[in-house]
Amino acid sequence: MSADYDITETLDVKGASCPMPVVKTKSAIDDLAEGEILEVLATDSGSMSDIDGWASGTAGVELVDQEEGDDVYKHYVRKTK
């Protein structure tokens, strides 16, 4: 699915546990321009619900997609404003 997205930056938070994937995602999103997409790579299964919940409750971001693969969880987050 990632081929459908023009990924601006990739954030590798593999090995980090809650709340660090969300904290680092927020920091990285703050540095992007409107419309740009951040790919987040995580190994914490909790990141699936954590990043979804954060994006749902945060103005200016949209969770475009999430993928679960070989021990890596991928999240695609767009900055909307």
Curated annotation (Swiss-Prot):
Does the entry feature the keyword Iron, yes or no?
A: no
Kindly give the Gene3D superfamilies that the UniProt entry links to this protein.
Answer: TusA-like domain
Any one Pfam family here would be TusA
Q: Where is the active site?
A: C18
Alphabetized, the UniProt keywords read: Plasmid
* InterPro entries associated with the record: TusA-like, TusA-like_sf
Spell out the family assignment given in the record's similarity comment. Answer: Belongs to the sulfur carrier protein TusA family.
Name the chain's protein: Putative sulfur carrier protein VNG_5061C/VNG_5236C/VNG_6059C/VNG_6467C
